[in-house]
A protein has these predicted regions:
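Serine-hydrolase catalytic machinery in alpha/beta-hydrolase-like enzymes
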Residues: 2-99
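C-terminal catalytic histidine-bearing segment of alpha/beta-hydrolase fold enzymes
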Residues: 31, 171-211
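Short alpha-helix in the alpha/beta-hydrolase fold that links the catalytic acid
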Residues: 38-41, 141-142, 166-176
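Active-site signature of alpha/beta-hydrolase-fold catalytic machinery across serine-
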Residues: 40, 116-120
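Short beta-strand immediately N-terminal to the catalytic nucleophile in serine-hydrolase-like folds
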Residues: 104-106, 131, 157
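Gly/Ala-rich beta-loop-alpha elbow adjacent to hydrolase catalytic centers
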Residues: 106-110, 114
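A conserved short beta-strand
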Residues: 123-136
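Short beta-strand/loop motif that positions the catalytic acidic residue
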Residues: 155-158, 162
Length: 211
């Protein structure tokens, strides 16, 4: 097994060319999804003149087990996945996009990955938009975040109950991100299916409109 299973996968780009972009929206697909799929979710929410970047997971899955499994069970896939998010951020930075004009979004497994990356690499981003996800790690295990999100807008939205993401983890993630300086909004949708709704997209668009 390679130590970097996602390392050879590409990053798909649409929207404004990076050198001309006013900002960048990085989108992370869920288990079984593709970069092309998640870019379709980004199109209704990305501001004009923004670029969109979507890394592709090997085998269409960022890590093999639940985000609530012991972290070691999801290695080396999890570390490799976080590396692909880093690569997308670095692409934007190298093109001259400031970090506070880089937003990171994802759905389900991709939302967990987005939340984990931002929580472990805090700085002022344009936004974190996590549709049905939360910080990664088993229930009951301590999660400690350090650093400063410096007022980064954070939108965490999910159904309750959800078959994969307990609401308690969404709330815990919101609390922890707020403790390190995130400006957190949570949206709880009783009975919502495991999907992204139009209302969630409108909320995300509102966040990015002022990014």
């Amino acid at each position: 097994m390679t130590s970097d299973p996602h390392g050879t996968q590409g990053i798909v780009s649409i929207g404004s060319p990076l050198p001309d972009a006013a900002g960048v929206l990085i989108l992370l697909h869920g288990r079984g999804g593709t970069a092309e799929d998640i870019l379709g979710l980004g199109e209704p929410i990305a501001p004009e003149q923004w670029a969109m970047l979507a890394p592709q997971a090997s085998g269409n899955s960022w890590y093999p087990f639940s985000f609530l499994a012991p972290r070691e069970q999801n290695e080396p896939y999890l570390t490799s996945a976080l590396g692909r998010v880093r690569a997308a951020v670095d692409m934007a930075l190298a093109a001259g996009i400031a970090a506070d004009k880089i937003a990171i979004a994802g759905f389900s497994q991709g939302a967990c990955l987005a939340t984990e990356f931002v929580g472990r690499n805090p700085r002022r981003y344009a936004a974190l938009l996590a549709f049905t996800g939360g910080l990664i790690g088993p229930p009951g295990a301590p999660i400690k975040l350090t650093g400063d999100l410096a007022g980064t807008p954070v939108l965490l939205s999910s159904g309750d109950p959800d078959p994969h993401v307990p609401w308690a983890r969404v709330q815990q993630s919101a609390d922890l991100l707020q403790e390190i300086g995130g400006r957190v909004t949570i949206r709880r949708y009783p009975g919502k299916p495991h999907s992204v709704t139009g209302e969630e997209l409108r909320s995300a668009s509102d966040v990015l409109a002022v990014a």
